Amino acid sequence: MATLFLIIIYLAFISLGIPDSLLGAAWPMMRPDLGVSFGYAGILSMIVAGGTIVSSLASGSLVQRIGTGRLTLISCCLTAGALLGFGWAPSVAWLAVLAIPLGLGGGAIDAALNHYVADNYKAHHMNWLHCFWGVGATAGPIIMSFYMAEHNSWREGYTAVALIQFSLVAILLITLPLWKRVAAIREKEQIGNPAPPAQAEAESKASSGSLSKNVLRIRGVKPSLAAFLIYCGAESLVGLWGASYLAGARNIAAETAALWISLYYGGITVGRLVTGFITLKVRNTVLIRWGQIVAVAGGVILLLPNPSFMLAGLILIGLGLAPIYPGLLHETPARFGRENAARLMGFQMAVAYTGTTFLPPLFGVLAMRTDISVLPAIFLILMTVMLLSAEKVNRILHNHSASAQK
């Protein structure tokens, strides 16, 4: 039953990943069809992320009221209905309206399942959870690229993805009773198997032994939140504007650009699958550091003049980004205490999607005033700032741990 339950959680994250990459892949064809400028993709992305921020902040209380299973089911229904509406929307104004439930559904799934896995499973499960997000994010542009190339239609692509989402809704509905059974089993296991003394002591030191009324005052939280903000901003920046960069600055066909963006998400997916095994031997902090370095190398490759290097750069960026987000999430209970983790996870999701909300649209404004070719340079700046923020968290927590042992 435990294996079946994990499969259900992974399927839920596939449903979360599919819509995340669709807009950027379809936009080169959507834009002229709707008769709007480049910047409207950023506005739609901002609305989606705004809904995600709201539902992320509310996820803690929603889980307590209706449970993780029901919240996941309702959220998947919202995203499926919104995607179906995208396929039939007559104008960009309707897309803006439908972006609201799309964001609300995605944020609730993200925050609730991330907290559940961080609190109940090991680091490799967190990496594999986000690997399955990558499966969805990779599949989205592939599906869209097929309909754009074979049917010359982005609308059919959205409709096909909506039908996939509704099939996942059916699976979640059938297996809904399993959530309560697993929760009861987990509760019995925690009562019968208390944490080892070393683990309990580590968690006590991480949280200073009590529930913090203001999680923002915990040591290291603020630079950690900055890392989340910049990570999601950088990841969505490439996902949303990568195809437009390839088509506009590198003269690559729109359907090929959409396919290459799917391979960028494929790099994230494969990277998380592999790092799930690596976490059995290597600490999250080490993987986060090296992931940032690899992503920077991919960004440098995008600056090269030869278009044939672009695919390699995108895949390398995806591989580098792979361990960062799940690693930061899984470290939350250990760094800041399990009793603070639920509330802090909601803050982290909200801040992360704030990056998704504002950084890609701001780049859209910048691209309209300058040129889409500045994408690699902006990405490299963001990655540098994130690296500095992540290392600051490590330094603060290391100094705090050293002083606590004296």
Where are these regions (language model features)?
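Interfacial helix-cap and linker-helix signal at transmembrane-aqueous boundaries
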Residues: 30-31, 62-63, 143-152, 246-247, ...
